[in-house]
Amino acid sequence: MNIIDTHCHICSEKLLPLHEEILKECSELNMEIIEVGYTLESSESAIRLAATNKDIYASVGIHPSEYTAEKPEELYSRLYSLSLSPKVIAVGEIGLDFYWQSPKSFQYQILELQLDLAKKRSLPVIFHVRQAYHEFYEFIKPYNFLSENAVLHCFSSDVSWARSFLNLGFYLGFDGPVTYPKNDALRQVLTFCPHE
């Protein structure tokens, strides 16, 4: 059985010293990896890493908390160019994050541009949402092309929100917090979700 980790940041500064060890272990486990971009630079790094290994793929995107003064049209143009790499299989990590102080207007604008990119390139989307489930849901509902083409990574809300996103055809990703001893509510969401 192959394992696919759909959300990695192996190129992050913290993991660079362990880079070779991680890649070796993944290879031994027959694991495929999606190295997820969250800035232009990390998207470029993801593509470079993917080019070195047949089991690594890349996504390109601007995380909602990664505010930049660069014009949105320029960001779009650069992301579009990056998305043409044959190892790019998704757009992400994109979404809304109201925990950090990134301007909401920027977050909505860059989210819309990146959804346009995903649609034009027929790529699935990796979403990041934090303290913005209602706003994100209302914004995303009209984007029908996302049905069965989107994952909401590190899901951390309740069964009601899980049901809402599953009804849109989204996949939900669960990360480390589901293992925390006091996080029974999130484990309840996990048991509610379909196995695939």
Report each predicted region and the residues it spans:
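Mid-domain alpha/beta scaffold segments of enzyme catalytic cores
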Residues: 1-196
